[in-house]
């Protein structure tokens, strides 16, 4: 007797019966859905699964295409596996590493015993297209973790063997594509034919893997030159290689061998050295006739701008200057006056969430030598208040303006460029899960924000996750276009950071109920954090950038 299951489809708000053991693809076809770009994965009771996932109980299902962030991740992972297989077939003695996002694509390093040329790129792209045309199925294989570790070790894929060996999981899964095996953090599409659009081009010394635009999947993401960003990533990759820590498996082994404190101390010292170098650059400009009046510090949400500005101020003071940090957040309009986005929700990332006329008037008064009273924004009440702090600047004083819009030319249009020093701060995660699974920098920042919002702003993880897509859209519009204008870029991510955030984030994420849309993201983040060993924060210095989110800072916020 066939057991029938009741399946509710969120895409069309219909319920239908299906045989037990039906795949998600069977269910999609059974509902006769017509998604413009086709499904690539689905949320099953708010957990993302691949389309070959079999259903054995009544479920709520929502099918996802590549316009959805989770769907795009599935598409991208599948494309990566195709790239890995193409390189394996073309260069049996070579390999490829997927390193980090840059220029609206993903930077890859092709490891050969020679430099790569345009003909290599052409061959790889042609081979990838052949693999896609052949519509080869992706096979998901579940096994005991020890078996997977042994298999990857035999294949010389030690990055994956180390990751799985230190993950603490009894069982794991890996994927097979023809004769090629690999491990991916998350689901893949059923077969290579699901990949419709991609490109791969030569980019400096490596390759750039390009993907469709999520809002318009019939077009590739526009290629944006980000030379400074690439330089920062590559510098930190070189530093990680010197330390022998390029992947999470390397990191976990080092911590298990008692080196966590060393990694904390070295990472913190490197950041302090970078901050001191930036302070020296500003001082050098002042000594060479360029009067820097404003240091503008921008960066996306939870990049650590505030603590960076305070630490930079200390370094400037050691150089004989008198910095005064001012947070642009204190110039927010009252919450009820915040502009609305296209969905009718408050757009806190908009430039016009700031009271620009008031800010410009106060800045002019300061630069004219007048005294002002600084405002303070109360995030609890959503109102701007008088702080009681008075400020007048003198010849040796530098204003440190920190906020997401600091690099936007519209913020300080009347200040000559020679009087401004611009700094872009972001958490550019340079460690990877393994050679084919990079860690999104947005995950790093989202975890910071979840912890900070919960501890200091009385927001649940559900609320923070629900707003994150809007935050990201605001960053794309208001922040990222100006990052290459910076005179200096500072990477606020710390090598050990995610292992420290883990113990703070996990209990907050577990509070997200499984019947809400944010649960799928909370579940994904919990699975991600499970790859890291825990590192306690007792060795963190009180001036650490992480203290801005965790507490225990010697700075006042």
Which residue stretches match the model-derived regions?
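Auxiliary tRNA-acceptor-end handling modules of aminoacyl-tRNA synthetases
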Residues: 53-72, 95-273, 278, 283-288
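Conserved nucleotide-sensing/catalytic segment adjacent to the nucleotide-binding pocket
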Residues: 324, 333, 337-380
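Hydrophobic positions on the alpha1 helix immediately C-terminal to the Walker A/P-loop
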Residues: 308, 312
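Glycine-rich phosphate-binding loop used to anchor ATP phosphates in small-molecule kinases
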Residues: 359-418, 468-482
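Ubiquitin-like/PB1-type beta-grasp interaction modules and other compact soluble beta-rich domains
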Residues: 2-104, 113-114, 126-127, 229
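Conserved lysine of the Walker
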Residues: 305
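Hydrophobic anchor at the beta1->P-loop junction of P-loop NTPases
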Residues: 295-297
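Conserved NTP phosphate-binding and transfer environment spanning the P-loop NTPase/kinase superfamily
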Residues: 286, 413-557
